[in-house]
Amino acid sequence: SDGGAGGGGSSNLLTGTCPSSPFISNDSNLGGNTLCAIVGPITSDLTLTTDVMYRLSGLVDVGVDMGGDGTKSGGVAATLTIPAGVTLAQKTPDDYIVVQRGSKIVANGTRSEPIRFTAASAIDGSLTNPDSAIGLWGGIVILGKAPINKCSNDVRGTAACERVVEGSTTAIMGGASPDDDSGVLNFVRVEYAGKEIFPGNELNGITFGGVGYGTKVD
């Protein structure tokens, strides 16, 4: 992913107020912009605003795993909606987001106003190697209930065919719904992401696991 523009000059600073939500807290000032921390798990629908910047505060789960058939006990479905032009600027490799099975991310950017997941250092001007920097924050993991092939033949294609996704030690993917809908990603830029969980298991910029064809990515 490319580095892109920084936080911008004073003419386009985002100095609004953090939304009132149990999943958002005041963080700090970032390059003159108001920074609001998103805290998980997000257990009801949340829509971000466009007059501030955000960061993922550690692991942010969207929803609680609904299972391969959407009926898992304790599961909670939630939708995170990110409007066009919003920037999420993470501070550490431990900042990442997991959209659990049965939940959605609706990130509808546009060509002129993309949604940007980046590093805080790219906003405040402290990033020294923008052309080669990686691993400054975790990434995006999207999990669905669509069939996967990494299980035994006797359960393949059923809701019991599930496994832990790469980039995690606990997040589960898979199910029996080919048309499963995990949301929308349109004009979303992911910069400076990636994290090694342990050797051979790492987060990438965007990880899809068991995502069905109802999910829209453009």
Q: At which residue positions do the language-model features occur?
A:
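Beta-strand/loop edge motif enriched in small/polar residues
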Residues: 1-218
